[in-house]
Amino acid sequence: YRYVLDFIAQTRKEAKIDLSYGCEGFLGNYELSVRDYPFFCQAGINVASVLNDGSISGCLSIRSNYNQGNIYKDSFVDIWNNEFQIYRNRNWMKTGECTSCKMWKYCEGNGMHLRDDNGGLLLCNLSKVNWIR
């Protein structure tokens, strides 16, 4: 995992190709060396997705039980203005290993796509990279 992040950071320094790490989650000290902006899961905050079945979600990668409505039955504007609270207030994510994490204010529980059907954290990117290098 660190090998890939180190490769991306080095490639960006060399500036021979444009390379950036996607929205996979908070990476601690790697943040600005592997992407242009610090991690921020925009799902349901300033990004929404309509899936092929009409489901309205914050992101195509998020589990279906986090869908907020359906474009064939619901007004997108109403859904956007009145739903998505689970995306916009992430305090419910501050459980398990996130409860005492000193980096919570930067990470806010990682990306929504890294949560299981019950809201449990599937992967903590920060612990995977061991944020102190």
Roles of regions detected by a PLM:
Residues 61-133:
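Flexible mid-to-C-terminal extensions adjoining Fe-S/redox cofactors in radical SAM and related proteins
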Residues 1-57, 61-67, 71:
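Radical SAM enzyme [4Fe-4S]-AdoMet core and its adjacent flexible, acidic
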